């Protein structure tokens, strides 16, 4: 009944969408800072704006940014919907720091992303739930409280979106995202499957895959992974502060799970483990108290932020959206939207899920309905770590068995550039029919942020666009950049270098200006001192000639300059071989192509 009701609403919205045309959402790239310095051939066709979910023009609406595919030989006619998590965090994180066509430099200008996923399909970044990013909740200001409501909104959005972009309806639909999107994506996939069941074949959405990166899928089981994960990194033991308390919390969580499903969304006994761990594992002694970064265990942050000041590019994104004219170019009214906020706590606090189950319960049914799942995980993440994701997969039932079966294929994943002369260890892959797990080496909670070009290989693995090889007793799965990828990477690195040089010159000019001003100030002070010294010496004669000595006045101006830096302390971690547009090198893992044997 609910799906039929939504269908009727969607049909009404589709009719209303006739009033909206693609031209209403066209983004003139040259209005975005930095794009004029990029080769036009490298700039994708873009559309953006607010897609209404109601016929009321001031009603609920979701903001989207569409980047058309530029994929050459690897085009597979896919629409990849990307969602960030939170809940309440903007998918512009994904658009400008992860899988989109651009990254943002320190001055707020765009440069090419060498690992953009739009070289594999059309990317659609959506701010949701309502109230997130530039999306609006409507006249009444109501925010969503249940995942099922979010799924309803997503269906309405897609109905309206496809009416405006009918060519995308013919594409295969891939739902992708990270973190709390591990809740969104299965719910949205389930809504699509139920919708399709009531539609004629030609009217069905072509949902094929769900790709969850460092996903929050099973809150209870994943909470049990924190202690063993940090222990495996040598950060937790008997000497740890609150050691016994944390072990008691771990035991209480396990016992609660053993006694059956939670009455709410998750067991309260499991929710306190990570916060207590973060407060108990300090960083090296510093003037300020530090803790591990919950999104990248290699990093440190100021307590109690513990990762909330991360990633490093975040201030650049704020600067981009704060540049005059940017919001107008994206068809957003700055007077209505206000400044961009990455994550809105009000949205997170509203989504209590009093009547929703964790998405893990939907996955077996989706697999039976023919939906494939790819779980990819950066191996340096704490909050949604590898152990927790593998634990939840082990509890999933599909094709009559629990977890990965004896038929599971295991691969060492290597990534190669186009000439295939050297390979870089990228991760490990487990594949069992419709379920794939990928552990990505040297990557954080945001895999594409750390290893952009390697992250693009995840899509190739999902499509089986890979090479198989053997090295010793190990089976190898190899992803290879296309010629178009190499061209994009070369142009991206050149574009990035231009931005770097411009910033360097700008900073140099600023420094010279500062030195000149400082020098002029010092000269002025010296001049004033000399002047008053001479005045003290010759003052009587001057006053006698020019003024009445009894009416003279004096003044003194205090001069001070405070150049103290008060930025966030992030610890001593150095990325080493990491560089935007390149790889993290894994020591002693380069392999010559001569060592490969095809199978």
Curated annotation (Swiss-Prot):
Its main location: Golgi. GO terms for biological process: apoptotic process; proteolysis. InterPro entries: AB_hydrolase_fold, Peptidase_S10, Ser_caboxypep_his_AS, Ser_caboxypep_ser_AS. It is found in: Golgi apparatus, trans-Golgi network membrane. Glycans are attached at residues 406, 442. It holds the Pfam family Peptidase_S10. Residues 20-512 are lumenal. One of its GO terms (molecular function) is serine-type carboxypeptidase activity. GO terms for cellular component: membrane; trans-Golgi network. The keyword Lipoprotein does not apply. It catalyses: Preferential release of a C-terminal arginine or lysine residue. It is a single-pass type I membrane protein. The keyword Cytoplasm does not apply. Residues 534-599 are cytoplasmic. PANTHER family: PHEROMONE-PROCESSING CARBOXYPEPTIDASE KEX1, SERINE PROTEASE FAMILY S10 SERINE CARBOXYPEPTIDASE. This is Pheromone-processing carboxypeptidase KEX1. It comes from Eremothecium gossypii (strain ATCC 10895 / CBS 109.51 / FGSC 9923 / NRRL Y-1056). The lineage of its organism: Eukaryota, Fungi, Dikarya, Ascomycota, Saccharomycotina.
């Amino acid at each position: 009944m609910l799906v039929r009701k939504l269908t009727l609403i969607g049909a009404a919205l589709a009719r209303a969408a006739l009033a909206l045309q693609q031209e209403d959402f066209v983004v003139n790239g040259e209005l975005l800072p930095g794009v004029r310095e990029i080769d036009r051939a490298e700039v994708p066709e873009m559309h953006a704006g607010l897609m209404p979910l109601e016929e009321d023009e001031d009603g609920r609406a979701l903001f989207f940014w569409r980047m058309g595919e530029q994929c050459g030989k690897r085009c597979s006619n896919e629409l990849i919907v990307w969602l960030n998590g939170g809940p309440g965090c903007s998918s512009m994180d994904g658009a400008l720091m992860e899988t989109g066509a651009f990254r943002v430099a320190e001055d707020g200008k765009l440069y090419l992303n060498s690992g953009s996923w739009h070289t594999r399909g059309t990317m659609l970044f959506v701010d949701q739930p309502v109230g997130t990013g530039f999306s609006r909740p409507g006249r009444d200001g109501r925010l969503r409280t249940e995942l099922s409501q979010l799924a309803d909104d997503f269906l309405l959005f897609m109905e309206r979106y496809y009416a405006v972009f009918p060519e995308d309806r013919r594409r295969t639909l891939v739902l992708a995202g990270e973190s709390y999107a591990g809740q969104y994506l299965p719910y949205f996939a389930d809504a699509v499957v139920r919708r399709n069941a009531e539609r004629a074949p030609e009217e069905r959405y072509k949902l094929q895959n769900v790709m969850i990166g460092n996903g929050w899928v099973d809150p209870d089981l994943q909470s049990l992974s924190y202690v063993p994960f940090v222990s495996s990194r040598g950060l937790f033991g008997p000497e740890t502060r609150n050691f016994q308390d944390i072990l008691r919390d771990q035991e209480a969580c396990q016992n609660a799970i053993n006694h059956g499903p939670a009455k709410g969304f998750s067991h309260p006994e499991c929710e306190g483990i990570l916060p207590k761990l973060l407060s108990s594992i300090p960083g090296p002694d510093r003037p300020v108290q530090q803790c591990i970064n919950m999104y990248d265990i290699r990093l440190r942050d100021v307590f109690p932020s513990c990762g909330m000041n991360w990633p490093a590019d975040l201030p650049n994104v704020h600067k981009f959206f704060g540049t005059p004219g940017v919001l107008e170019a994206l068809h957003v009214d700055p007077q209505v939207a206000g400044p961009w906020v990455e994550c809105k706590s009000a949205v997170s606090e509203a989504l209590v899920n009093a009547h929703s189950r964790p998405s893990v319960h939907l996955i077996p049914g989706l697999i039976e309905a023919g939906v494939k799942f790819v779980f990819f995980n950066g191996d340096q993440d704490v909050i949604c770590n590898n152990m927790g994701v593998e634990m939840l997969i082990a509890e999933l039932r599909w094709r009559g068995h629990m977890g990965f079966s004896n038929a599971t294929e295991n691969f060492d994943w290597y990534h190669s550039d186009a000439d295939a002369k050297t390979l870089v260890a990228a991760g490990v892959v487990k594949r069992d029919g419709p379920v794939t797990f990928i552990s990505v080496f040297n990557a954080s909670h945001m895999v594409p942020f750390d290893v952009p070009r390697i992250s693009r290989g995840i899509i190739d693995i999902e499509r089986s666009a890979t090479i198989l090889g053997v090295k010793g007793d190990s089976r190898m799965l190899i992803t290879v950049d296309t010629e178009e990828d190499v061209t994009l990477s070369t142009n991206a690195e050149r574009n990035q270098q231009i931005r770097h040089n411009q910033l360097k010159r700008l900073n140099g000019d600023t420094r010279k200006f500062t030195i000149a001003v400082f020098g002029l100030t010092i000269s002025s002070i010296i001049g004033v001192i000399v002047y008053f010294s001479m005045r003290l010496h010759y003052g009587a004669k001057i006053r006698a000639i020019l003024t009445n000595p009894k009416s003279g006045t004096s003044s003194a101006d205090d001069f001070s300059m405070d150049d103290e830096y008060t930025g966030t302390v992030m610890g001593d971690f150095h990325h080493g071989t990491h560089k935007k547009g390149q790889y993290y090198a894994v020591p002693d893992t380069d392999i010559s192509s001569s060592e490969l044997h095809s199978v």
